[in-house]
């Protein structure tokens, strides 16, 4: 493709055109300054390379180990799965690693499947078995790791439930819908209704329950979501602290969640509350002429906690920057009829955020964390 970069001076705007023919970093310079672009093979192609790498290299195979079937961190320098997390919970087989299962299930629901179907289905079934039998207790309390249990962390529940609901939609197996609702009920029992989860599965959860014919449970879950949404509306800009005192991944999930509950109910209180949060969210976005800092959230601490060497910038940008894209995307959907111009701008920003976050995927399918 051809990139067009605008350099704005006091007197004029200079547009530099650069044809991107190779993958990797591309510098576009003008009068002592420059923009940093990234050439990739293609958005979908890069995602599919990542999916194939996960299938080929990141599912643990050891029946004697409780982590058998888990998607785990891959050491790109050691060229192997990282089996020793060195006591660092951010490197274990639970927690954020659930995102690999969600990614695969979400891909399975897409229109085109280029990744091997038999291998794909088997991997997901093995992973679902691992999650239910090793990462959860019978009552759906959810662990952070399969060996010692780790911290009972509220964030884990929404991710596991999202995975189950996507599996229900993908396979038509009602048990996955039951597992999804069971996991969310466990979340509410233990953490109440005021926890600011990342990725409350509003849309996927309601759709999965409806598809499974679980209409009563669907209405119950919607009421649970509304109860949480009411608390978020009441709190407004007084965001509670969680693992970090104040951060993008508290605000962005709240905006996304309120927008999805608005879409499910039509109650404008929820959309109004989301609108009031947007300036706080936008204040945490970079707008620099670099693919690492354009529509990317400021998350310097995660570049330390998640990096291999625990040096600030190890992970740059951090993948949770993409939560803002989900928030912008849902907000754009909500205002599409009332303000098409603003909706188009938020959708553009959402897509830019996702594109730039794709720099965490390499052309051979590996990733930075």
Task: Report each predicted region and the residues it spans.
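Extended acidic/polar, glycine-enriched regions
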Residues: 1-48
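Acidic, mature catalytic/reactive cores of soluble proteins
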Residues: 26-27, 112, 355, 362
